[in-house]
């Protein structure tokens, strides 16, 4: 438990399911006040509030919004401030992937992934940092990146890799720019995790075994293991900024990836 998170206001994009949901529950357990963001499925967001967060005694609201729409992101941050009086932590978690051969990829395919993963994270970071600067708050921004930001290129995922590679330098640049104001900006780089976005792939025994063979710890992670992102938001990480914290079971240390697996 991180006692200093009690009473903090945390916005998590894309938090009605998957990693975002687990993070919302974890922060609620830490007694933070949580803004659960969803794009279209209000029932999933309400389920997180009613069946998960209230169960641990947490306080939260659900706010609809598409991270690719600037006005929606502005509203998301303003809703947190209006409801809870402030903002302390912004977690840009919303993301997507859509495997397509590079030579067959349409501009629409490309833009959809870039707009969600990279532009959405920029908009969330910008709005949070704007509030922090204007109110002299030493806030925290955490972006949900991937092992693909660094040294794991992957066929059919050129748009995804570009979005996460861009996120790495975006995060490092923001961290450098706002460190003098005490604002911290970091990435989390998950490896293979059991989430809805991976459900179809991991349901295939052969594909699952292939992925597990590339993880030194030997198993696919659970969303709760990424929810340790709470540490990065706490005062225990007060001297940490501009990094990517990989939570991947050692996947980035796999010998073939060290050589640049394609």
Swiss-Prot record:
Chain residues that bind substrate: 146
Keyword NADP part of the UniProt annotation: yes
Keyword Oxidoreductase in record: yes
Record-listed E.C. numbers: 1.1.1.47
Record GO terms (molecular function): glucose 1-dehydrogenase (NAD+) activity; glucose 1-dehydrogenase (NADP+) activity
Keyword entries, A-Z: NADP, Oxidoreductase, Sporulation
Active-site feature positions: 160
CDD domains tied to this protein: GlcDH_SDR_c
PROSITE patterns xref list: ADH_SHORT
GO biological process entries: sporulation resulting in formation of a cellular spore
Catalytic activity: D-glucose + NAD(+) = D-glucono-1,5-lactone + NADH + H(+); D-glucose + NADP(+) = D-glucono-1,5-lactone + NADPH + H(+)
SS bonds (residue pairs): none
Chain sites annotated for binding NADP(+): 11-35
Family, per entry: Belongs to the short-chain dehydrogenases/reductases (SDR) family.
SUBUNIT field: Homotetramer.
The name this protein goes by in its record: Glucose 1-dehydrogenase B
Species, as recorded: Priestia megaterium (Bacillus megaterium)
Gene that specifies this protein: gdhB
